Amino acid sequence: MVMIVAGHAIVHGLGFGNIQANTNNNQFGLTYFEMNSFLAIAVNCFFWISGYFQIKRRISRAIELIVETMGYILLLNIILYIMNYSGVVYYLDILRIIKRVLFFYQGYWFLTAYLILFIISPYLNKMVEVLSQDEKKELLITLFLINSFCGFVLKIASLDSGFSVVQGVYMYLVGSLCRTDDIQNFFKKKGKILNVLFVIFGLLNGCAAYIFGSKGYNEVAWRMFSYNSPVIVFMAIVACLSVVHCSRSSKICDKLGKLSRYSLAAYLLTDYPLIREVVFLPLKYMNSMSDFEKILLIFLYAIMLTFVCMGIDSIRKCLYNYIENKLNI
């Protein structure tokens, strides 16, 4: 989640996402392209981990996620409305807030994709379970060819963008298929080599994006960070397998895993279009700093912001449980 927040800080806070439309990208040096190359894997990692450990669908949890999201959006819009309050309550403003709350999926593609994935996960899990080892490897290769080659390279309609439910299902299945003994044993033997390739591919991908951007190929430069890019997918798989193998012998990962239940607020508060401009406003005053200082500050700010959001979400959960207990009485 820290990686996702740091990615939001660069893309939305510093305006790095605008490189696809700008003709002059000199304001962003090679460092930003390299940094975003490694941060772009975070969303894929989230879906992959969900598939590896396999989601256990509970309707109550799906409803809870929807209610939490709508509650946060309502609260954020009320706060923004009060901050801009002119002394007159406009009917259209109220309707606009209601629309944003009810149609929250228009601003949160990632959460929407996860909710849909949450609903269909039992069927995906059963499909993977009945496949043989060879069939699983065949399916893994087929999915890669369809989404990462046909989608990213050939730009086939509805597959060319990684910002979709298709990408979520793709990475979920990849995560499930990586549970096979063959892949686990392969990673144990070649883990160090794969980790080196992870770093090399990340650096080369960022460098290529920077070169394309400096030559005026802005859309191509931004496309290098697409979630269905073969490089981004490969890096996400290697990163996740490394974490999974480390977590088997590390209690720290278990403790960090318990904190993930409070991570919803970090995503909701840093990716909402109306609020992220305020959240990342302090980062706009880093012009006089060196690139190294900027990167360090971005990560520190992302860590701080993540834990602040987790604190807010933990308070919300306490209030939710308190109200629920009172109602049960």
Name these PLM-found stretches.
Residues 136-183:
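Loop-centered beta-sheet repeat module
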Residues 59-60, 118-145, 177-197:
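Solvent-exposed interhelical
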Residues 279-285, 290-291, 316-329:
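Membrane-proximal cytoplasmic C-terminal regulatory module of class A 7TM GPCRs
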